[in-house]
Amino acid sequence: MNVAGLIVGLGNPGKEYERTRHNLGFMAVDALMEAAARETGGGCDQLSGGKKKYDLWRCRITPTGDPWLVAKPQTFMNLSGEAVLAIASYYRIKPDAILVVHDELDIPLGRMKFKTGGGNAGHNGLKSITQLLGTPDFHRLRLGIGRSPHGGETTNWVLGRLSGPEQTLLDTLLPAAVQAMTIFASQGAAAATQFANAYKPD
C-alpha cells in the first residue's frame, strides 16, 4: 500500500484523559479526519482499531497524491515511541515523512509552531519517539497550552481540563492546526512552518 507518510497525534487513551491539555494531539488529528471526510470526498478508512499500541487510519487529506496514515497511540504518552516505531517499520515510513502533533508548554494557548528535529523540551512523548526511532529528525506541530499562571506541578496542569475561555481559544486553534497539517501534506515542511509560525488567533 502506497502512503505519503504518517501523521501522529499524541495523547493518553481513556475517558479520564479526554479534553485534557495533554491530549491536544488527539484532538487535532480528530479534527483533521473530520475535515478530510468533508473536503476531499474520500475521508478516512480505519486500518486498526482497538490494538494494544495504536489506532490507525488511512486518510485522503489532499485531493491528489497518495493517502496519509493518521495514528493515535494507545500506549500512554511516555511510550508513544512504541506505536510510532511499529507503524513506521511495518509501512516503511522514514522519519522525514513523519509529523508528530503534540501539546507544548512553552507556547501560549491559541498559538502553534512547526519545526523539524531539535530537542524534546521535556515532553515525554517526543522523548520516547526520538529514542525508538533513533533520531530526532521528524517533524513536529507544537500546539500551545502555556504554563499554569499559578505555578505548581506541571503534571497537574497538563492533565487538567481546559477552562471555558481556554476552550474558546482551542476552538479557534484546531481549524488552523488542520490547515497546517494539510499544508504539510500538500506542500511540505517549509510551507507548513511559514503558516504555523505566523498564525495568531483573532
Swiss-Prot record:
It holds the Pfam family Pept_tRNA_hydro. Its EC number is 3.1.1.29. It catalyses: an N-acyl-L-alpha-aminoacyl-tRNA + H2O = an N-acyl-L-amino acid + a tRNA + H(+). GO terms for cellular component: cytoplasm. InterPro entries: Pept_tRNA_hydro, Pept_tRNA_hydro_CS, Pept_tRNA_hydro_sf. One of its GO terms (biological process) is protein quality control for misfolded or incompletely synthesized proteins. The keyword Phosphoprotein does not apply. It is found in: Cytoplasm. Keywords: Cytoplasm, Hydrolase, RNA-binding, tRNA-binding. The record marks 103 as: Stabilizes the basic form of H active site to accept a proton. One of its GO terms (molecular function) is tRNA binding. The active site is at residue 22. The record marks 12 as: Discriminates between blocked and unblocked aminoacyl-tRNA. TRNA binds at residues 17, 76, 78, 124. Gene3D superfamilies: Peptidyl-tRNA hydrolase. Monomer. Belongs to the PTH family. HAMAP family: Pept_tRNA_hydro_bact (MF_00083). Hydrolyzes ribosome-free peptidyl-tRNAs (with 1 or more amino acids incorporated), which drop off the ribosome during protein synthesis, or as a result of ribosome stalling. Catalyzes the release of premature peptidyl moieties from peptidyl-tRNA molecules trapped in stalled 50S ribosomal subunits, and thus maintains levels of free tRNAs and 50S ribosomes. This is Peptidyl-tRNA hydrolase. It comes from Nitratidesulfovibrio vulgaris (strain DSM 19637 / Miyazaki F) (Desulfovibrio vulgaris).
